[in-house]
């Protein structure tokens, strides 16, 4: 690996150290992380199977849930195998290109998940506020366009981050990344060159995706609450609100974890590094773990079909 004035020029590989300060207990940390991964994959796979084979669930609300489940599986799978390789098998090395590819996948799937949550909020808004137009607006073609749109938005907005790293950052102080996966700022901060453009673009993407989605999700639910509370019958209000509970829970835990991780990383300079890394890991691992549980508990149709799958023979 060529060096120049003490810096590394165009490194061929990086070293991921995992969770700095907790190297001695990483093998134990990997146990709950792997358990969350397995539960998340099984739970989300079960939701996908139920929605695929149950024709009554082939409606926008559950199609978006299937998109969310598939995204959760993909996001977790981008992170955990390599993380466990570091924690359990002492395999910290990752090639430069593989690291950038992992970074692109992780941030793209995060953006896709945010876009799906926005689509789910808009679906509930139309279903509750203008129900007579729901079937017309959320046609099969429109659902396909939404899926392609959130995917392309994520991929296109994240790609320039790779170009800025690959083409503009040539010299690195070290090849050791103090993280358990390849995260954008963790890589950028290793460079000796001016990284202001990278930082600005990173903030632009965060606000263009998360900021945009949060604003419109919030506006959707403000209008939903206004409409629900104007319903004359208490039973009708409860029924309408009940269709939103699971999505509200998923929305809150996804964005609260995201912003908590974001602000502690940028403004919590006095917080130990291992706290930052643990929060980043939890932000990515907890939503895919909790989402199928939340929807399994809070959504009657999903809950009934899970009971049918596991206890059908006993019931009959």
From Swiss-Prot:
InterPro entries: GPCR_Rhodpsn, GPCR_Rhodpsn_7TM, Olfact_rcpt, OR51/52/56-like
Cellular component terms (Gene Ontology): membrane; plasma membrane
Transmembrane segment boundaries: 28-48, 57-77, 102-122, 142-162, 200-220, 241-261, 277-297
Principal location class: membrane
Membrane topology: Multi-pass membrane protein
Function per UniProt: Odorant receptor.
Protein name as it appears in the record: Olfactory receptor 52A5
Lineage: Eukaryota, Metazoa, Chordata, Craniata, Vertebrata
Encoding gene per record: OR52A5
